[in-house]
């Protein structure tokens, strides 16, 4: 026996589900959705049925909802950076504004349908910004609002923007923001902290936020600032998707003048001298917060990019590196942040492949760096064809925590000491190699952690933007901050929709 949607609501009430039926009927009518417009649905597969939900979303959003067999569906699923996230959701809804996001979450909550949310899709963890056939994908790529306050001090950024577009928009005004280091990365990286080339001077991306616009699970659209919903404001700076869907935010700007940059390659046999230079740089050079460096250690060679906030050739902050034999890669020069991001982005392959990142942290220590590098060398020698593991130590200054505290605080629990965020960036072609490559990446950092613990230099903090799916990022913030995340989640999402229906992610209920 089959029923209309109205009939199903009546059937649900007979099963002591009257509140659900009543709320659902009211919800659909409030969105001007007439249940009689839909096909007949089996009452056994009503709530939680992604097919039914997609029919409702198509009726509600029209061309802003894309089904499996529609033109553009495949292209939308393959926006994500890593092929490991190229999966097929039941449908994709692409809201045009916060009001659309509100309608979408109201429908998903009413129909108890699983969902995932995607901004730029650079997160390589399957399910974090992708969804399978049992779920709906909310793509925020159309939320591309960009504006600048009259005094040029605040930039309003829609969460669908990528950082390259943001920098390009702001450059004619001679201002910029503390955003992502790669132009193709989506702006939602702010919710994980967001490491910028000049975070030593200005803090993490999250620390420069002045306002968040957030859609909550009941569909309400709220603002979070240092003085309004201040607990939500702080929790969003590192708390990711536990509270609602961020649709736009305001970032403080800074003057965008010419920057110094230089990139050099170091032969592999120079790694002991390079580690010594890295430690010395953190001990003294990083006290100059205008200085920053980016590292990339690969089988082909070890790349270090030197950056300085002022147009100064070979600043003294980098003195420890100048005596190590090297080969020029980018000669010394000056560039705007827009030009710099574009130039450095050339080094990142645009060819689709399988990607994963994993991270750990420890106090800066030459012996740990040398030990971990040695383990990495052993492991990369065993990799299958068309697979690579990049070893990326990121020096973090002791003052980074204070930068966050200065502007309302964040939820990260950063160590107030010089330390290293060590990333392993995995890239490979063959799905059959998934387990081998992922296990190899984990092995390197497990061994590194064990050695760091033996030296009493291990730090529990995990940088969300570079973490892998199985890492307990929220727990790494410390018990006090984790408990704050739980409290804020329960306050702003009392139905716990984002815990129960949202796909994979760094959610407190899964740690």
Swiss-Prot record:
GO molecular function terms noted in the UniProt entry: FAD binding; oxidoreductase activity
Identification of the protein by name: FAD-dependent monooxygenase AOL_s00215g279
Superkingdom as given in the UniProt entry: Eukaryota
GO BP annotation list: terpenoid biosynthetic process
Result of knocking out the encoding gene: Abolishes the production of arthrobotrisins A to D, and leads to the accumulation of a pair of epimers without the characteristic epoxy core. Shows substantial reduction in conidiation. Shows significantly increased ammonia levels in fungal mycelia.
Keyword Cytoplasm assigned: no
Classification via InterPro entries: FAD-bd_PCMH (IPR016166), FAD-bd_PCMH-like_sf (IPR036318), FAD-bd_PCMH_sub2 (IPR016169), FAD-linked_Oxidoreductase (IPR050416), Oxid_FAD_bind_N (IPR006094)
Signal sequence segment: 1-17
Induction record: Expression is down-regulated by the cluster-specific transcription factor AOL_s00215g275. Expression is also down-regulated by the HOG1-MAPK pathway downstream transcription factor MSN2.
Functional pathway: Secondary metabolite biosynthesis; terpenoid biosynthesis
Entry EC number(s): 1.-.-.-
């Amino acid at each position: 026996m089959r029923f209309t949607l109205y009939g199903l609501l009546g059937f649900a009430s007979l099963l002591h589900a009257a509140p659900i039926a009543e709320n659902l009927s009211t919800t659909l009518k409030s969105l001007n959705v007439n249940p009689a417009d839909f096909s007949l649905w089996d009452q056994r597969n009503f709530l939680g049925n992604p097919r039914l939900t997609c029919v409702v979303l198509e009726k509600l959003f029209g061309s802003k909802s894309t089904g499996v067999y529609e033109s553009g569906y495949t292209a939308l699923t393959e926006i994500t950076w890593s092929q490991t996230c190229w999966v097929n959701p039941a449908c994709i809804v692409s809201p045009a504004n916060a009001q659309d996001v509100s309608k979408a979450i109201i429908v998903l909550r009413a129909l108890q349908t699983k969902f995932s949310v995607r901004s730029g899709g650079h997160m390589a963890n399957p399910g974090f910004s992708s969804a399978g056939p049992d779920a709906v994908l909310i793509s925020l790529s159309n939320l591309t609002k960009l504006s600048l306050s009259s005094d040029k001090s605040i930039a309003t950024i829609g969460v669908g923007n990528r950082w390259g577009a943001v920098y390009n928009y702001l450059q004619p005004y001679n201002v910029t923001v503390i955003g992502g280091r790669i132009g193709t990365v989506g702006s939602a990286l702010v919710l994980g902290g967001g490491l910028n080339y000049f975070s030593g001077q200005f803090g993490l991306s999250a620390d420069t936020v002045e306002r968040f616009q957030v859609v909550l699970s009941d569909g309400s659209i709220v603002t979070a600032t240092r003085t309004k919903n201040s607990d939500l404001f702080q929790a969003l700076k590192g708390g990711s998707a536990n509270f609602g869907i961020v649709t736009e935010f305001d970032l403080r700007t800074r003057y965008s003048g010419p920057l110094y940059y230089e990139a050099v390659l170091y032969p592999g046999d120079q790694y002991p001298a390079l580690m010594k230079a890295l430690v010395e740089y953190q001990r003294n050079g990083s006290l100059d917060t205008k200085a920053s460096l980016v590292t990339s250690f690969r089988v082909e060679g070890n790349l270090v990019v030197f950056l300085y906030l002022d147009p100064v050739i070979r600043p003294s902050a980098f003195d420890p590196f100048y005596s190590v034999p090297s080969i020029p890669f980018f000669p010394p020069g000056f560039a705007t942040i827009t030009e710099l991001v574009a130039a450095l982005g050339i080094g990142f392959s645009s060819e689709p492949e399988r990607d994963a990142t994993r991270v750990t942290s420890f106090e800066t220590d030459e012996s740990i760096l040398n030990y971990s590098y040695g383990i990495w060398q052993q492991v990369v020698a065993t990799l299958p064809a068309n697979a690579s593991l990049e070893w990326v130590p990121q020096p973090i200054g002791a003052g980074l925590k204070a930068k966050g505290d200065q502007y309302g605080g964040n939820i990260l629990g950063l160590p107030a000491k010089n330390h290293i965020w060590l990333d392993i960036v995995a890239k490979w072609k063959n799905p059959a190699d998934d387990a081998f490559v992922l296990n190899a990446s984990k092995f390197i950092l497990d061994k590194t952690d064990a050695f760091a613990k033996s030296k009493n230099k291990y730090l529990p903090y995990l940088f969300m933007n570079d973490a892998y799916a199985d890492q307990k990022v929220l727990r790494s913030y410390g018990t006090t901050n984790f408990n704050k995340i739980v409290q804020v989640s329960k306050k702003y999402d009392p139905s716990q929709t984002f815990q129960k229906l949202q796909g994979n992610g760094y959610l407190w209920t899964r740690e």
